[in-house]
Regions:
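Short acidic, glycine/proline-rich loop/turn micro-motifs
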Residues: 99-100, 263-269
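Short linear elements at protein peripheries
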Residues: 141, 252, 282-283
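Generic recognition of well-ordered alpha-helical segments
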Residues: 178, 237-240, 284
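C-terminal amphipathic/interface module of NAD(P)-dependent oxidoreductases
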Residues: 269-297
Length: 297
């Protein structure tokens, strides 16, 4: 990764911070894109303590604000001639329905719309042999998970946090697979792939539900080790998708087990591979964000 530029969203904690650490350790310049400059700088300082001389610029970006995403994209254009790797890692889960500054349901705005907009706005910066990686979740394949285009904001459905989160993570996969189809159609060699971390012992996973919270209790750590893994291990699927020279567009990586293990190829739910749904979501995402993709061969 020496000499390459990577952008990691949500790099101020958990899997994002660990992903940035590993990329920096292998010589990449890593842009830490996060809401809090202070938290980002703290992560950068911690990485530099382990990787002296690491190049870790911190970029403020609130994915729930399209204006913030546009400003961050403009700063990337000003500061870098190219981006080799974009890892759309950041994610949130809100327990009570709220809306973003743009009026969209917060989880969907952050997890999907912000990343859709960012990727489109920096597409011209991405190197021909570059990678775009979407970090999804096992929740994308739950039986209850759907993408309801007529009600993406859960205004007319019961607001169940895991259903809301699952929809946003399924949207991540629909987006990245449709992106790969459009890249291939344009004749570009840029690769779009996806990953999920399993169940990593990060602060975020403790918010996913009662089971995850229970497994995070100190008294149950010996039991939790049977089904969870460290953030170091949880970052490996994303890192493989971003750096393995053998990765092909549209591939999806996750742990060997359902929740833990080294990264291997997985097949997502059939819904995630639905090209018609993906195309309709793409059209709706362009309408909601005002970002229209322009592909170059």
């Amino acid at each position: 990764m020496s000499g390459r530029v990577a952008v990691v969203t949500g790099a101020s904690a958990g899997l994002g911070a660990q992903t940035a650490r590993q990329l920096a350790a292998h010589g990449a310049t890593v842009v830490l894109a996060c809401r809090s400059i202070e938290k980002g700088e703290a992560v950068a300082a911690g990485i530099r303590a382990q990787v002296p001389g690491a190049q870790l610029p911190v970029l403020r970006m609130d994915l729930a604000s399209l204006a913030s995403v546009r400003e961050a994209a403009a700063r990337l254009h000003d500061g870098f001639g190219r981006i080799d790797v974009l890892i759309n890692n950041a994610g949130t889960l809100t327990r009570v329905r709220s809306v973003s500054v743009d009026g969209f349901e917060t989880t969907f705005a952050t997890n999907h719309l912000g990343h859709f907009a960012l990727t489109g706005l920096v597409l011209d910066l991405l190197a021909p042999a570059g990678r775009v990686v979407s970090v999804s979740s096992r929740a994308s394949g739950y039986r209850s998970t759907t993408v309801e285009l007529a009600d993406l904001g859960f205004e007319h459905r019961e607001y169940k946090p895991m259903h809301v989160y699952g929809q946003s993570k399924l949207a991540n996969l629909l987006f990245i697979f449709e992106l790969q189809r459009q890249l291939a159609g344009a004749g570009t060699t840029l690769v779009a792939a996806a990953a999920y971390p399993g169940v990593a012992t990060s602060d975020f996973n403790r918010n996913l539900g009662p089971t995850a919270r229970l497994l995070s209790h100190p008294a149950l750590r010996p039991l939790s080790r049977l089904v969870t893994q460290t953030t170091e291990m949880g970052s490996l699927p994303s890192l493989r998708a971003a750096t393995d020279p053998g990765v092909r567009g549209g591939e999806y990586f996750g742990p060997t087990g359902r929740t833990k293990g080294y990264p291997v190829l997985h097949e997502p739910s059939p819904l995630a591979r639905d090209p018609e749904l993906a195309a309709r979501l793409w059209e709706e995402s362009e309408r909601m964000t005002g970002v229209h993709y322009r592909f170059r061969p």
